[in-house]
Amino acid sequence: MGATVADLQATNGTAQAQAKHGVSDGRVVAVRGAVVDVAFDGGVLPALNDALVIPIDGAAPILAEVHAHLSDAAVRALALGPTGGLRRGAAVRATGGPIRVPVGDAVLGRLLSVTGEPGDDGAALAADVARRPIHRGAPPLAEQKSATALFATGIKVIDLLAPLAQGGKAAMFGGAGVGKTVLVMELIHAMVERYRGISVFAGIGERSREGHEMLLDMRGSGVLGRTVLVYGQMNEPPGARWRVPLTALAIAEYFRDERAQNVLLLMDNVFRFVQAGAEVSGLLGRLPSRVGYQPTLASEVAALQERIASVEGAAVTAIEAVYVPADDFTDPAVTAIAAHVDSMVVLSRAMAAEGMYPAIDPVASSSILLDPLVVGEAHVEVAIEVRRVIEHYRELQDVIALLGIDELGADDRRIVGRARRLQRFLTQPFAVTEAFTGQAGASVEIADTIAGCRAILRGDCDDWRESSLYMVGTLDDARRKEEAAREADARRDAAAGAASGSAGPQGAQHGR
């Protein structure tokens, strides 16, 4: 029978803490929401980030984390669970170390909380399951491996214009409702299908409904068996939401270090991590910084991002969804996160409104991997030309809106036509949306994407319908769609001609 995480923290840590560190049991002296002050009489205090276990009669124990030493005999801790029912005078047990979460094969296919407790309908974890602390440093610089290998996603616009690095960090920036979570789910699908690696998903401060839907979708698609889901939901205390990425990182680091397996680490949403940190900062009495964020914003983001690293033989590839409040890309949280990523995938509300999914802005998105030494000369040349054509089209949109496209010169009209076709060609159906759209998902090789864009830039598709290039995979798929449309037009014209021919004599007779 499985023990609760809080029980394991207490069982594994209390004897060690009291014997080795001399920390005696404490007692609660104040409760202010999620902040709990604890007094210790032995003269030795638990270290910062150590876990404390607070038993409650008739309820699961509360796990808290030490964040400040108030005096020689008291600490301030942050509860990772609801503190309802907690009273002054309650006993507190020090564990002698940071929170430890389960890792290894036992957690594959499971949904876990910030403390590693299963949140699905599966069996309890065994008491002897391997565990790792959530607080660890980044690998030494000498052991880290730079990210230069391409991480092909099968998503045309990403692979062409903002390629991801295997072992690198990529962030998808966008406001509410532009498709960040759908992109994350598609990338999980790509990882399982293409790389046969492990995926670790951290749901940070997101809706419970979305987490439930993702769990069911993964079960249905068969990818859950190689995925670990770690959730700190929107309704949980800020401490839980703040520590969820560290729990996910501890699990990913285990598979990287102990199993030498490639790991795809997905975090949705990193902005909620910053938001939870701001709440924690306020609860602990720190003065806010710009726009109300915590004064330690930059260091907290850096501590998280620098742990995402690759070593010889195994890579952790991080893909992070970042909510942009009020579509303001100058927000301090957004700029702090952007400073650490290799690839920036910017989602556009305007493109989403036009139905251009994935709604990725081809001009604003960028990647340090878009370099001839990494992806090759041909790739870079096509990417630059695609960006140039689409950017020129955007410059002409105001003129078109005022005067109409017929007032443009021949060269500008040609650029407009090719830019619109490129925008449509860079859309594609996703496997994870097949149940809603009825259209099978398409995964496209980078070579096919480059060849298709080069053909459009060359003018090979100037006489094609724009709709033939919309929501297809390769250019061959678009060609078949165009041929089918032309055949349908020919049949319709033939039927119309036959109908008008048969109506001709009758019309003449009625005229007489």
Swiss-Prot record:
Binding site for ATP: G174, G175, A176, G177, V178, G179, K180, T181
Catalytic activity: ATP + H2O + 4 H(+)(in) = ADP + phosphate + 5 H(+)(out)
Chain segments carrying region Disordered: 479-512
CC terms in the record's Gene Ontology section: plasma membrane; proton-transporting ATP synthase complex
Membrane topology (UniProt): Peripheral membrane protein
EC number(s) given by UniProt: 7.1.2.2
Subcellular location(s) per record: Cell inner membrane
Chain segments annotated as coiled-coil in the UniProt record: none
PROSITE patterns: ATPASE_ALPHA_BETA
Major location category of this protein: membrane
Biased composition (Basic and acidic residues): 479-494
InterPro entries: AAA+_ATPase, ATP-synt_VA_C, ATP_synth_F1_bsu, ATPase_a/bsu_AS, ATPase_alpha/beta_chains, ATPase_F1/V1/A1_a/bsu_N, ATPase_F1/V1/A1_a/bsu_N_sf, ATPase_F1/V1/A1_a/bsu_nucl-bd
Keyword entries, A-Z: ATP synthesis, ATP-binding, Cell inner membrane, Cell membrane, CF(1), Hydrogen ion transport, Ion transport, Membrane, Nucleotide-binding, Translocase, Transport
Pfam families from the UniProt entry: ATP-synt_ab, ATP-synt_ab_N, ATP-synt_VA_C
GO MF entries: ATP binding; ATP hydrolysis activity; proton-transporting ATP synthase activity, rotational mechanism
Keyword Membrane in record: yes
Subunit structure: F-type ATPases have 2 components, CF(1) - the catalytic core - and CF(0) - the membrane proton channel. CF(1) has five subunits: alpha(3), beta(3), gamma(1), delta(1), epsilon(1). CF(0) has three main subunits: a(1), b(2) and c(9-12). The alpha and beta chains form an alternating ring which encloses part of the gamma chain. CF(1) is attached to CF(0) by a central stalk formed by the gamma and epsilon chains, while a peripheral stalk is formed by the delta and b chains.
Function: Produces ATP from ADP in the presence of a proton gradient across the membrane. The catalytic sites are hosted primarily by the beta subunits.
Protein family: Belongs to the ATPase alpha/beta chains family.
Protein name as it appears in the record: ATP synthase subunit beta 2
Organism the protein comes from: Burkholderia thailandensis (strain ATCC 700388 / DSM 13276 / CCUG 48851 / CIP 106301 / E264)
Lineage, top ranks: Bacteria, Pseudomonadati, Pseudomonadota, Betaproteobacteria, Burkholderiales
